[in-house]
Amino acid sequence: MKIIRIETSRIAVPLTKPFKTALRTVYTAESVIVRITYDSGAVGWGEAPPTLVITGDSMDSIESAIHHVLKPALLGKSLAGYEAILHDIQHLLTGNMSAKAAVEMALYDGWAQMCGLPLYQMLGGYRDTLETDYTVSVNSPEEMAADAENYLKQGFQTLKIKVGKDDIATDIARIQEIRKRVGSAVKLRLDANQGWRPKEAVTAIRKMEDAGLGIELVEQPVHKDDLAGLKKVTDATDTPIMADESVFTPRQAFEVLQTRSADLINIKLMKAGGISGAEKINAMAEACGVECMVGSMIETKLGITAAAHFAASKRNITRFDFDAPLMLKTDVFNGGITYSGSTISMPGKPGLGIIGAALLKGEKEQ
């Protein structure tokens, strides 16, 4: 099955409410959509959201990487030699992880369609349902508690709470108010998005431990490049610490695992450059006895479906952060994963299971 066409288009989908973290506020989910057509007539789909403050990718840079570098190298290639294709994607240019991830998605989609199996089964097939958390954006303690209570009513038993934007006293007040409103049975995991200094993180986490707030884990408490600070927080607290922005590549995962700087790793396809890099990170983590979560950027159901296929395939991936499509006003794609409250069911169709998209106003073909 040979690649005969690679196309991109742009989409923009409004969120139902602003998504706020310590790093940014998002009002609209923007993405570059990739479509690879094969000589069999099959179409593979991929998605790359621009996340400048995390991956450094913009809409223009994603399209440029795809059309000026990846597309010329891939046209005419056969999926029978997919290992060489994946190597080319990762080594033809540095960085540009979201562009690489989107092209890889469309290739894995085509590969699994060629084999006649859902992608998650091709990759390991460990499970066919997932339980996702729901993210509570940074706002006042009262508004965050109200949001948390609303998500609980929708069936979510695990909430991911954004912190790190203000002082630690305000963050602790947020968690106290949320815990009071949702009760003790709901899992609360925190994400500081690099918003604390190491000493602040240790102080905040210890205070929450002493208050009995029952925090499941704290994600990326300190700056992504401060592995010594991350390790300090990990060693000084009882609450499990998860590395997120500190781990893009397998090499960075190796450094975190070797130094035991974190207890857990959050893998995202947009950081890892696609499924091939994500598999390497998870394999190393599993060899070291470290469990992984798979999360995402603000993506449509297309990108989340690809991430869910990867996550569903692996035993060592034990936590899932796939709420982004639920934040959007419009479901752009047909097919893919389905939601029932917090439960995600994997599609049974070959490949990703995406069967088409409704073109949005202003979508631009390249």
From Swiss-Prot:
Substrate binds at residues 24, 135, 160, 296, 298, 321, 323. Gene3D superfamilies: Enolase-like C-terminal domain, Enolase-like, N-terminal domain. Pathway: Cell wall degradation; peptidoglycan degradation. It is an enzyme of class 5 (isomerase). Keywords: Cell wall biogenesis/degradation, Isomerase, Magnesium, Metal-binding. Its cofactor is Mg(2+). Catalyzes the epimerization of L-Ala-D-Glu to L-Ala-L-Glu and has probably a role in the metabolism of the murein peptide, of which L-Ala-D-Glu is a component. Is also able to catalyze the reverse reaction and the epimerization of the other Ala-X dipeptides L-Ala-L-Asp, L-Ala-L-Leu, L-Ala-L-Met, and L-Ala-L-Ser. Is not able to epimerize other L-Ala-X dipeptides. Is also active with L-Ser-L-Glu and, oddly, L-Pro-L-Glu, but not with L-Glu-L-Glu, L-Lys-L-Glu, L-Lys-L-Ala, or D-Ala-D-Ala. This is L-Ala-D/L-Glu epimerase. The gene is ykfB.
